[in-house]
Each structure stands twice: as structure tokens, then as C-alpha cells.
Amino acid sequence: MSEKVVLAYSGGLDTSAAVKWLQEKYGMDVIAVTIDVGNEKDFTLIKEKALKVGAKKAYVRDVRKEFAEDYIWKAIKANSMYEGVYPLATALARPLIAKVMVDIALEEGATAIAHGCTGKGNDQVRFDVGINTLAPHLKIIAPARQWGMTREQTMEYAQKWGIPVPISVKNPFSIDENLWGRSIECGLLEDPWNEPIPEVFAWTRPVEETPDEPEYLEVEFEQGVPVAVNGEKLSPLALIQKVHDIASLHGVGRIDHVENRLVGIKSREIYEAPAAVVLIAAHQALEAMTLSKSQLRFKQMVEATYSDIIYNGLWFSALRQDLDAFIDSSQRFVSGTVRLKLSKGSFRVVGRKSPYSLYHKGMATYDKGDQFDPSSAVGFITLWGLQAKLQAQLQPILEEEKGNKS
């Protein structure tokens, strides 16, 4: 009896070619697993394709709800933006995919898990580390990392075996998408001087095709988690879709970024993340009103580490769980509503309110009703500037003494 290998199957070029390659190279029975994390695909056709290209069995698992509640919501509370730009859509889905792959491998009695990651990308690290953490006894096979074929050669290999190839050699974009965003790379995008052609974008409208009138969007949060849009309570999936639809209509969410990959190289990446950029910005605005200065400053350091953890494939680490404990505690009073204005490819926060706001109008106003006691400022300024004053007075003397001795 042949050994079983569970393959993370997307229906794309690399994983379709991998089915045949695993059979040729290892003589293993391939079990294809396709995981729905919000991909806009026909999963029935993908399952049929997996069986057609040689898989012994094919699974489709819908984990969108789990992805939103257990991954995306955590990312929002942590304001997760890698290098301050990328909302980590692809990176955030990888640990969940690894978890489902391990679960099915254990159910099937498989001895190995395979994925279609290349040797240059970050995903190979995310999958390998996740799988090794959850099930270290399982062997990991990465065909695209081993076979040494270029993308064009992989296309030729697939065509040799009659595997449909849905992309062209002339413009071979590699695309990944889920609830939280869409990433596009390869082809002409590998030259960072090239402007992305219109065909790169599938979610967001070009600015010239967006409405002339701006649109207002209100997002309500409860303890750091978005729960309603424009006054309507929504499920996690419906809420993300609602914000996505409004933001993409106005051309919001396009990102063109040269980022530092985990493997040590720089990569030009194009992203579409309309819901992500809007919801994270709204959350940050609410935190600015409900967290103290010291909380915000410390949390910003935590957020940078948290984003790196996601990007670097360490979701299942103890440190991520430890940071979650702090982040969850910080969100106790992050409840309220944020109003945003979207227009012509951009947006900005134009209002916020919270029953737990630390903004005190009576203390901040310069108009009638001012409750701030200006006489308090004199003593504060004296103490606040004492360190600088003493240093200015004492160190020039010390420097003169040093000069006299030399």
C-alpha cells in the first residue's frame, strides 16, 4: 500500500503540477485539500480538477468563520501591519491552513504534507514551521522547492500532462486572495519601476471610475472588535464584506510595496486590502481616544513584534499567545464608533466617539467652559525642565575642567 501525502491544493499551476510530480517522484497517493479562507473561487471545480489531475481524494474545507474570528480579529486588535504597510492577509491565513492540513493528515493516516511554496518565498517558512510545531512527526515535501523548474518550465510540465494552465507565459502573475486581502506578484511586477497595469487589480476600482461624491462609513467596535457598520450589527463575514464593498467602490486599499522577506531578499508586492486598511485605521483612531499615552506607546512596540510574528510564521509560538494576553487586556475599553470619509482612492477618519473616551472637552477647550487650571502649569514646567536645566548648567563646567587637565 502506498503512503499518503496531504497536499495543500489551490487549483493553480504549482499545486496542480505537484500532484503528478509527487506521484512520479515518491509513488505516493495524493490527498488534495483545498481550504476556503475567503477565496473567490469555484471550489466544486477545484475539487474536480484535483481528482482529474490524479489526486486519490479531494477535500474542501470552509474555514472562513474561524479565519475571521480567531485570526483577523486578533490582527485588528493588534493593528497588524507589517512594516507599517502590509495588513498580512496571506501571512495570517497560513497558520490556519497548516492547522487544517495537519488535522486531515492525522485523520487520513498520512505520513507527509506537501505544499506548493517556492524556495524564495515566505510561505514555505510559515507552512513548515507551523506543521513542525503541530505535528513534528509528519514529513514535509515542497515540490516547487525541489524540482528546480522555472515558472515557464512548470507551465510546460503541466501542459505535458494535460493540466490546464490558467495564466500566460507573457504575464505570469502569482495571485493569492482571502477575506482579508489579495496579493499579486511575479511577471512585469518584478521590476519595481514598472507601474502595475490595470489587469493587476481585481477588487478596487481605478480612481477615475470611482464615484464623484464621497461616502461616509461608521464602524462600531466592542472591546477592539468591529461589530457593526453604519448602525447595522453584522456577523464577522458580513461585516468584512460590507466594508470591502464600500471601500473598493471608492478605490481604497491599493498597496504597492517593496518589502523585506523573511528569507533575506526584498520583493515588490502589490496588495488589495480595502476592508483591512479601513478597519485597522478605524481601530487605531478609537484606541487613540480610549488608551492612555503610556498604553499606546507600549502597545506600538508590541504591535511591531506581533506583526513580525505573523509575517515570520510563528503564529503557534508561546510569545504570540503571551502578547495576545496583553493585547486583549488593552482592549477592555476600546469600544465606540469611528466615522470615516472615503473618496477617490483615499480615506480619513473624520469622527470618533466612545463612552470610555479619555478625551475631556472641558480640559482641552480654549473656549468658554475651560476647566483647566493654568496655574498648575508653572510648577509642572519647573519640574519637567529641571533635568535639562541642570544638565545645561553643570556639564559645560565639567567639560571646562576636562579641558584644563589635558
Curated annotation (Swiss-Prot):
Keywords: Amino-acid biosynthesis, Arginine biosynthesis, ATP-binding, Cytoplasm, Ligase, Nucleotide-binding. It is an enzyme of class 6 (ligase). L-citrulline binds at residues 86, 122, 126, 174, 183, 259, 271. It comes from the Bacteria. Pathway: Amino-acid biosynthesis; L-arginine biosynthesis; L-arginine from L-ornithine and carbamoyl phosphate: step 2/3. Its EC number is 6.3.4.5. GO terms for cellular component: cytoplasm. SUPFAM superfamilies: Adenine nucleotide alpha hydrolases-like, Argininosuccinate synthetase, C-terminal domain. CDD domains: ASS (cd01999). ATP binds at residues 8-16, 116. L-aspartate binds at residues 118, 122-123. It is found in: Cytoplasm. One of its GO terms (biological process) is L-arginine biosynthetic process. It catalyses: L-citrulline + L-aspartate + ATP = 2-(N(omega)-L-arginino)succinate + AMP + diphosphate + H(+). The keyword Disulfide bond does not apply. Its main location: cytoplasm. Coiled coil: none annotated. One of its GO terms (molecular function) is argininosuccinate synthase activity. Homotetramer. NCBIfam families: argG, PRK00509.1. This is Argininosuccinate synthase. It comes from Dehalococcoides mccartyi (strain ATCC BAA-2100 / JCM 16839 / KCTC 5957 / BAV1). The lineage of its organism: Bacteria, Bacillati, Chloroflexota, Dehalococcoidia, Dehalococcoidales. The gene is argG.
